[in-house]
Amino acid sequence: LSEKLRALSYSNTPDALPQELARALFQPGGRYVSSMTRLETYRSCPYKYFLQYGLALEARDEGEIQNLDLGNYLHAGLHQFGSTLTRQKRQWRDASDEDIREISSTIAGALSEKMKYGILSSDATSRYTKRSLDRTFRETLTFLRSWSQRSEFDTKDLEKAFFFHLAKEDGETLTISGKIDRFDVKDDAIAIFDYKTGHTEATLAEIVAGLKLQLLTYLLAVEQEHPEEQLLPAALMYIYLSGNVTKVEQVPPNGNVNLSEKDHASGYVLADPSLLKSLDKDAGESDSCLPVRFTNDGSLHKGSASALTKEQ
């Protein structure tokens, strides 16, 4: 009875974690090392951050293909293909149809064997998923080659690791680490790209709120690595590997699997028409990946909200 009476006046007011407990959960090695994904998670939902990164809770692996697995598959494939071109001192625009077909086949074969102990070849449905995924992989490579052929920018680096330190008010240091999927250069101009599976956008409101900070952090990391250079940020963009990559629940009657809409990109670009044309000579046209439009006199359309000045 006394417990029930206490329940009447109970107030579920969350308290801050004791400092020692917080250190044990989030600084097991004595240092706080984080990523922008983690910090974005905290800004979005502190409780989710606590469960995911403090208690290390995760969904039970039931041995099934998840959308995250498919995204990692495509991401790893693009990195390996790009690295192959880099070793050969070639750009994306230099890849032939035969390169895309043969190199992607080799990469896909190796990746599928590593995915959950070869689950992509475990049954007919999974094998259809694999073939559909491989097709999406080839289509994405073709898309990236096409863009590169329209661009004067060259790929400078892939999976570029970075870290920097931020001083906290209590005197300790917060280390931010991460990897930049890809950045391209032309003279002193840089374009930073982050590969995403599915549609992802970063509004200015989300950036100000700390919910979408990856692209800006990548730019900061590149600038800090080249302090002697006056880099010109031409573009900060997400490249969509697929609009809707999902596992195939059952083999369709016609044998075709509709995985995605046309690959494209979103983000922010510098409001410089000539620079944008060097990033994509079709900038402003319907088939361009740059989110801008031009007026008849060649200036940027006022409705091009994704085009910002350098000061912005």
What kind of feature is each model-predicted range?
Residues 1-312:
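Structural signature of nuclease core domains in nucleic-acid processing machines
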